């Protein structure tokens, strides 16, 4: 977008813009600083420990809701994908840094599940569905409707359940293996039984 387009869209005088900013990049930089720390909004107000199953599901649902309701976030993501500059690189890095403590908590607690990679796929899907919603339905799901939104919300709940069921199964197998070992059952038999 050119400065002249921005000034027209914002309905401000060029002098007002140039008194505050030297160029469009400076404006974008300032704009992003005000709007891009939305990840904390996603985790605020969660009633469950953020490193629990219900906390995880709540984070995914809140992310979907925030992107559904706040088009500014979508525009920032769209810009980040479309252009590579200092501002877009920095905001991508900052978003990653804000998420890092949460990622590390899940990674530590759920070692047998690559929850980080699974989460990356889910979050990427949430981003894409929301970026795409103004174009057309995706997989016959229309995020512009309440029905479509509810379907995605339910799917996020199901995905969260599946991820944690896998971890619970791994934990159970580990407990059973330990008890079998305590009762003198060989490693080979334990492996055959639990694979």
Protein language model regions, located:
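Helix-turn-helix
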Residues: 1-26, 30
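Alpha-helical DNA-contacting segments of helix-turn-helix folds
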Residues: 28-35, 91
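Hydrophobic alpha-helical connector segments
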Residues: 30, 43-73, 112, 119
């Amino acid at each position: 977008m050119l400065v002249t387009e921005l000034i027209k869209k914002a309905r401000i005088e060029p002098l007002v813009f140039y008194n505050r900013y030297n160029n469009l990049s400076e404006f974008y930089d300032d704009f992003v600083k005000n709007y891009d720390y939305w990840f904390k909004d996603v985790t605020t107000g969660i009633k469950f420990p953020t490193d629990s199953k219900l906390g995880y599901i709540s984070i995914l649902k809140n992310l979907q809701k925030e992107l559904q309701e706040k088009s500014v976030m979508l525009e920032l993501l769209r810009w980040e994908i479309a252009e590579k500059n200092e501002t877009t690189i920095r905001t991508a890095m900052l978003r990653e840094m804000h998420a890092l403590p949460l990622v590390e908590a899940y990674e530590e607690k759920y070692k047998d599940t690559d929850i980080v990679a699974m989460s990356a796929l889910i979050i990427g899907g949430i981003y894409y569905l929301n970026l795409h919603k103004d174009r057309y339905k995706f997989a016959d799901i229309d995020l512009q409707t309440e029905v479509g939104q509810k379907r995605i919300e339910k799917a996020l709940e199901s995905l969260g359940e599946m991820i944690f069921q896998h971890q619970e199964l791994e934990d159970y197998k580990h407990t059973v293996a330990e008890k079998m070992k305590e009762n003198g059952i060989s490693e080979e038999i334990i492996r055959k039984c639990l694979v």
